[in-house]
């Protein structure tokens, strides 16, 4: 038999610990990050590269070949390549004073109106104002025959004649004296008619 000592038992005290051979055991749920090595002759980019700087939305990035439009003092945009002609320009909304053609102003005795005829020429027509119909004939234009006339008047018994007749009866005037107001034209109503076409125009009442 040989005198060599027996080989050490794998589980004996002289066996190296598992931690000494393979290091610390990995922690469950955690994996070591994979580090990619660059190929020979190339270097990794710096790690502090971030997103491009932020610019406010009101100032867009100009593109190559783009010419910004011209902005006037009042805030209006003008297309590129357009320039106003030189010379003084009045501000917007300003109208220089100057002589203007006379308009259709009303003259004495009536008011005027401008009427366009089919030929396109402007014609001034004078329209008479409303006349005051009273106890005397009036010069006017007949609304029926459209002629300049002087009205024809006639007298008719009206309300004022009856009121004066009842007043005479109340004061004791009998024996037909109450009919005296009906015989006076100054107390009667006045009717205006056209002497040409005999059409009725207006009735002037002494007492409404």
From Swiss-Prot:
One of its GO terms (molecular function) is zinc ion binding. It holds the Pfam family zf-LITAF-like. Zn(2+) binds at residues 142, 145, 194, 197. It comes from the Eukaryota. It is found in: Late endosome membrane; Lysosome membrane. Signal peptide: none annotated. The keyword Metal-binding applies. Residues 1-65 are annotated as: Disordered. Disulfide bonds: none annotated. This is Cell death-inducing p53-target protein 1. The gene is CDIP1.
